Amino acid sequence: MPPPARQRILDAALRLIQQKGIGRATTREIAMAAGAAEGSLFKNFGDKMGLLTELLSYELPENQAWRAVATEAPPGHGDLAAGLVLFMERAIVYYAAALPLTAGSFADRELLHRHQAINRERGTGPQLALQGAVDWLRGWQQAGHLDQQADLYAMAVALCGGALICAYSEQLAGPGQIRGGRDGLIHSLIDTVAGPHMTNSADADPHLRTQAASDRRAQG
């Protein structure tokens, strides 16, 4: 049984936007590639910017994998260090997938304004990732792994921002241009941003953090 029209449209939109960019991909092409009526696209998403917003905020596989960290590394279970490494790895992969999709809207003022308007109407946008990170970190704080003085919002901004600049640099300058590489950046950020606020002895020791991350990779 084929997937519902809504899912086929999302899948086709992702393929075409990746191939052509948001500015050049038309709603007619997307609907044809999905084997659906163009009216179905408008009914479900409004327009192609509505489609892009849905992909970036919820449907992009890399976004779903990033959000799954909350259940794969639940607060209070296992160690925070390994959870933060997983969080950063998934965040970088998400931003690497999202940046090419959004590039076209930044290059076209009309598309950008439409994208901003949809985000305001739907309450979507990059701030969702920040709030999700804050909620996850708060769970670890409540479980006693982060001290009560930690500014969780600032911590989330630093971690997400580091992931974004890593993805951006790798795409425009190529891998290896970030000092220490991707893994080095992840561990340095965790040590600098979260390390001083970790209260669990295993989390707070840099050597044990690195070992925990290596163990998690070996298991995965």
Predicted regions span which residues?
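Amphipathic alpha-helical packing segments from all-alpha helical-bundle domains
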Residues: 82, 96-104, 112-143, 153-157, ...
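Short, charged helix-capping/linker segments at alpha-helix termini
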Residues: 23-24, 145-150
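Amphipathic C-terminal alpha-helical segment
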Residues: 93-97, 134-135, 139-141, 156-177, ...
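Amphipathic alpha-helical linker/stalk segments
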Residues: 57-87
